[in-house]
């Protein structure tokens, strides 16, 4: 769990914002949402594979767009 130290004369809002940012960087909220409901292993594998395919398609489309702009 992220820990922040509140500095002297630091407003509460600023400290809360720093804490939220550190939680987001640590990926706590995403992890909690992922574990909110049980996901069968087959469903998890299927979701991970779909994400990998999507990443690959995005990468290829970026490379193709770069090639088109070079000409």
Swiss-Prot record:
Record's keyword terms, sorted: Ribonucleoprotein, Ribosomal protein
InterPro entries with a match to the protein in the record: Ribosomal_bS21, Ribosomal_bS21_CS, Ribosomal_bS21_sf
Cysteine pairs bridged by disulfides in the record: none
PROSITE patterns xrefs: RIBOSOMAL_S21 (PS01181)
Transmembrane segments: none
Family of the protein in this entry: Belongs to the bacterial ribosomal protein bS21 family.
Gene Ontology CC annotations of this record: ribonucleoprotein complex; ribosome
Encoding gene (name): rpsU
The protein's name: Small ribosomal subunit protein bS21
The keyword NADP is annotated on this UniProt entry: no
Listed GO biological process terms: translation
One Pfam family per UniProt: Ribosomal_S21
């Amino acid at each position: 769990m992220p820990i922040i130290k509140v500095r002297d004369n630091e407003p509460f809002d600023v400290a809360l914002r720093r804490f939220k940012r550190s939680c987001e960087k640590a990926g706590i909220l995403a992890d909690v949402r992922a574990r909110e409901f049980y996901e069968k292993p087959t469903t998890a594998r299927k979701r991970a594979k779909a994400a990998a395919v999507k990443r690959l398609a995005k990468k290829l489309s970026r490379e193709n767009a770069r090639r088109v702009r070079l000409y």
